[in-house]
Each structure stands twice: as structure tokens, then as C-alpha cells.
Design a protein with these regions (language model features):
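Extended alpha-helical targeting/anchoring segments
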Residues: 1-545
């Protein structure tokens, strides 16, 4: 992949075209793209941009403690693949981070951070090989262009940040962290019905890449597509439907976890904890069709589809983990804790009544306040003095099955002491998926849950070339592998929690994922409340499993 004795420089080419007929999903299907990132809201519809990684250049994985460069399925240890580049001079000049005796990157030494060799630091070295968007004179600099890699950071990555041990077995076979570095990108601008085609090469690639020719070829290929030929409805798989729950946390098992957490809270060891239930669901519905169903019935700020060949990650998360953007050399970041849940009402009047009930529920508000304070504390770890503020508080957001209380915390990064990735470390994992105090809650979760969380509860999103970032919490998501969808959902437990109510909350949250495994006609006709898999019309299990 790389030859550090060559002098091939990073290149970028861009073309903007009219696009008022094709959709991101149809292009993903027709051209077998690797990644789709979208954003939409129940009240306002889809967001301005959608992003497709059409073809990949390479991947970076963390697997069993080793970092790999993956090219066309072949894994090479990262330090070996980048051997000619990992010099103290190169790394210090481009990244401003410490280097160990063998020339491999270490975490920045800072208050509260460890100094072990880190995945995010090594990912940053790879990111330095990407071209800068400014190299293309007509490329709008505000486009969401993930030149720093798009992918996920698994929940157990927290062991790199703090001295916590994870020993539970995995449910499926996937790396702890995985990022795709794109070769060709499509950015849909829905506001102006425009499409930006971008192709890139990376520094020191062995083979010279004609990025302008790639852009022209992609533009021509898109012109030949039409709505009919790129429709999922034209495939036999679109008629598949149904599912079978093969394994799931029982109501008794979950309520026992809640009781043990409440006992720890009573003893003063915890303030809050977020246990999850797991579910393995077999279904003939292919993951792209499942994603299509999910986005149709549950539009969310973070909708994602990642095809890693051996497995697929799809989801519709409502919750930001961290969004960081730099302007005039000042980096601001947002965290949006979501805590406090009610099911949606069957009518507008019932929905409003449930909203009022939620906002006046002492237990839910206490839970939300604890996690809001935790987010403020996490933001404060890497912010300048006085740089943390709550910019929105106790707002209600609605989704297909549930409504939530949401607040927003903003921080200003202390860039003299911290790298941008340190803000992600400070937020990871989100308090809404762990609890408070964070380390004690994570240790409690590890002792109670029987399997590794993996993607669930981690971060999913992308870095730009300058290490700005946009990551969601990996919830309302599924990992698909070998015909099985692996799902999880959790609920925040405090001293006043009712075990049965917490279990039912996890069922409400996971129901949107089960709904996506219905036939296409059912989803389009809104028949997502029909009985299936032993559930009642609200999608809740009748009694214990």
C-alpha cells in the first residue's frame, strides 16, 4: 500500500453535479458502496447532507490489542506497514505528540490521561497521510468529508483510557475498533439538489492514482443510473420478512441486574448505572433492506450503514457522543446527554400527556441531572477554564417508539494542553451508557452482563483530515453477521428504579430494531405494531422470558 521511498504526494479531485433523481440509498445499493451516513428528524425531515463512501482505499483495525492496516482483506501490523514513516521528526512535526523509543505514537501526556500507545494516536498518524481539502480550489470547506476515517470505536476501548479490565466473551466476530479510509466519496447536498464527487490519494502510495480520472469516471457512471435500476424493490430479497429471536436476556435476568445495582447505590458505591439486555435475532432480511426499513420508520440524527464485508453495522442513533468543529483555530465541541424515557402515545393528546408526565417525573429528572452533570464534568476535563456551558436543557425529542429528555453541553477545547482526540477520550463511553461514577459503573456492568458489548455503547462516526469529528453513541443499532442480527438496549438505574419498568424500557427501545425485520410492504403501510415474535401491540414481551 505504502512505499516511503517514493515521493507520491496526497491528491484530491472534486466535481459538483446536479442530482435531483438519485438518492443516497439507491446509489449505495446500485454501486455496492461501503458506507452511508444520513441524518433526519421526525418533525423537520432529512438534514442537509448525506455521505457515501463509494470505494475504500484501506482500513485500520484494532484487534486483540494489535493495530492493523487492512488492504483488500490482507492485514498487516500497523507499525510494520508504516515502518518507513514512523520517525520522531515526522510524527512530532505533523501531530505534536510524544514518540516512544521505537518511533511509534503514544498518547499525549496530560492530566487524567494515560501514556500508553493508543489506537487514536496511531489513527492520527494515518490521517496525516490524507490530502487537505484546501488542495481542491472549488471544494466547499464545510462539506462533511471524512478524510480522517469513518468507523466505530467499541465500548471496550475504554481499557485504553482507564485501568479497567474487560473479560466477557464476544457475541460476534468483529475488531474492537474499525475505520474505513475512503478512495471515492459522494456528498449529497439535499438543500440544493447537488452532488459532490471527491476522489483522493494518500501520501506515499506505491501506485500513482489519477484522482481526476476517477472523478470523471464516477460522474459518468452516475449519469447512467436510473431510479428503477437502482431500487431495492427490484430484488427478490426485498420480499423477505420475519425474524426468530434465538437468544435474549430474560426479564428475570434483567430485573436481577437492576436489583443488584440498586443495592450498590444504597451502599453508596454508585449513583447510577446503565445495564443492557442483549438479543440475537435470525432473519432472512438482508442488512441493506433492514436499514431501509429502519430509516423509514425511525428517522434519527445519526443513521448509518457500514459494510465491513464480514459483518455490517446499521443503526439510527438519537444521541451525539461528541461533535467537534474548529473555526479560527478555536475548537468547540458538543455533548448531548439523553436520559429520561417514555413510550410514544397512540394519539397527539396522549403523547402530550406522556411528555408532561416525563418532565414532571422526579426519578427521570434526577437521572437526567446526574448524567448532565457527568457530561459537564467530562467536558471540563479538556476545556479551557470557564469554557463549559449548558446551551439547552430538558428538551423533549420524539422518535418512532419513545420520547426522551435531552440537554446539550458545549465545551471549548484547551488546545494548548490537549489534542482534539482527547475530547473524544474524555466523553468515552458516554455516561448515558455507563453511569456515575463512570469507572465504578463500568466495572459493575462488566460484572453483571455475561457478554462483551462490542460496538454497542461505543462511538460511531468519522474524523475529518484536521481531526474535527462527529460521533454518535452506538445505540438503536445492530451488528449483522451470518444471518443473525445482534442487538442491545439499556436503561438507567437509580435508587428509585422499578425493575419491571426498567426492563420494559429496554423492550421499548429495542422494538424499532425488531420492526425493521418485517416485510417491506408492512413497513411502508405502517403495520409495525402487529403481533410478531410473541410481543403485544406496544412491542413488549408478555411476562418473563
Amino acid at each position: 500500500m505504502f512505499d516511503f521511498y517514493t515521493h507520491n504526494k496526497p491528491q484530491i479531485a472534486h466535481k459538483e453535479v446536479l442530482c435531483d433523481s438519485l438518492t443516497p440509498l439507491s446509489v449505495l445499493f446500485a454501486l455496492k458502496a461501503k458506507v452511508l451516513l444520513e441524518s433526519a428528524y421526525n418533525e423537520t425531515g432529512k438534514d442537509r447532507y448525506s455521505l457515501v463512501i463509494l470505494n475504500e482505499a484501506f482500513r485500520v483495525y484494532k484487534e486483540e490489542g494489535i493495530h492493523y492496516l487492512v488492504v483488500k482483506g490482507v492485514k498487516t501490523p500497523l507499525h510494520q506497514a508504516l515502518q518507513g514513516y514512523l520517525t520522531s521528526e515526522n510524527i512530532k512535526k505533523s501531530l505534536g505528540i510524544r514518540v516512544d523509543s521505537v518511533g511509534f505514537a503514544e498518547s499525549r501526556e496530560s492530566k487524567g490521561a494515560d501514556s500508553k500507545q493508543g489506537f487514536l494516536e496511531n489513527l492520527a498518524i494515518v490521517r496525516s497521510l490524507a490530502p487537505k481539502p484546501e488542495q481542491s480550489p472549488h471544494l466547499p470547506l464545510d462539506l462533511p468529508l471524512p478524510l480522517g476515517g469513518a468507523g466505530y470505536i467499541g465500548y471496550e476501548f475504554f481499557a485504553e483510557i482507564e485501568n479497567v479490565e474487560f473479560s466477557n466473551p464476544p457475541l460476534y466476530n468483529a475488531p474492537e475498533c474499525g475505520f474505513i479510509f475512503g478512495r471515492d466519496f459522494l456528498i449529497f447536498d439535499h438543500l440544493f439538489d447537488r452532488l459532490h464527487i471527491v476522489s483522493v490519494s494518500y501520501a506515499y502510495e506505491k501506485e500513482a492514482i489519477d484522482v481526476a480520472e476517477r472523478v470523471a469516471s464516477i460522474a459518468k457512471k452516475l449519469e447512467s443510473l436510473n431510479v428503477a435500476s437502482s431500487s431495492l424493490e427490484s430484488t427478490p430479497d426485498s420480499q423477505a420478512q420475519g425474524y426468530e429471536i434465538q437468544n435474549a436476556t430474560s426479564q428475570k435476568e434483567y430485573e436481577t441486574m437492576v436489583e443488584k445495582i440498586k443495592d450498590s447505590i444504597y451502599k453508596g458505591d454508585l449513583l447510577q448505572c446503565v445495564p443492557s439486555q442483549s438479543m440475537q435475532v435470525k432473519s432472512p432480511i438482508p442488512p441493506l433492506q433492514a436499514y431501509r426499513n429502519l430509516r423509514h420508520q425511525n428517522p434519527s440524527p445519526y443513521m448509518f450503514y457500514y459494510d465491513f464485508d464480514d459483518f455490517v453495522i446499521l443503526g439510527a442513533s438519537p444521541e451525539i457522543m461528541i461533535r467537534l468543529k474548529t473555526s479560527d483555530e478555536i475548537s468547540h465541541f458538543i455533548m448531548r446527554p439523553i436520559a429520561g424515557t417514555r413510550p410514544r402515545g397512540k394519539s397527539v393528546a396522549e403523547d402530550l400527556e406522556l411528555e408532561k408526565e416525563l418532565l414532571n417525573d422526579e426519578k427521570e429528572n434526577a437521572e437526567h441531572l446526574m448524567l448532565l452533570d457527568l457530561a459537564r464534568n467530562d467536558a471540563g476535563k479538556v476545556s479551557v477554564g470557564g469554557g463549559v456551558s449548558v446551551i439547552a436543557r430538558n428538551k423533549i425529542e420524539r422518535y418512532s417508539r419513545v420520547m426522551h429528555i435531552v440537554s446539550s453541553v458545549q465545551g471549548e477545547l484547551d488546545s494548548k494542553r490537549f489534542a482534539k482526540r482527547d475530547a473524544l477520550k474524555a466523553a468515552f463511553p458516554a455516561g448515558t451508557l455507563s453511569g456515575a461514577p463512570k469507572i465504578a459503573a463500568i466495572e459493575m456492568i462488566e460484572s453483571l452482563e455475561s457478554t462483551r458489548r462490542g460496538v454497542y455503547g461505543g462511538a460511531i462516526g468519522y474524523f475529518t483530515q484536521n481531526e474535527d469529528m462527529d460521533f454518535a453513541i452506538a445505540i438503536r443499532s445492530a451488528v449483522y453477521q451470518n444471518g443473525v442480527y445482534y442487538m442491545r438496549s439499556g436503561a438507567g438505574v437509580v435508587q428509585d428504579s422499578n425493575p419491571r419498568a426498567e426492563y420494559l424500557e429496554t423492550q421499548n427501545k429495542i422494538q424499532s430494531l425488531l420492526d425493521m425485520l418485517r416485510g417491506q410492504n408492512e413497513v411502508e403501510q405502517g403495520k409495525v405494531k402487529q403481533n410478531n415474535g410473541g410481543r403485544n401491540e406496544k412491542g413488549l414481551k408478555e411476562g418473563a422470558e
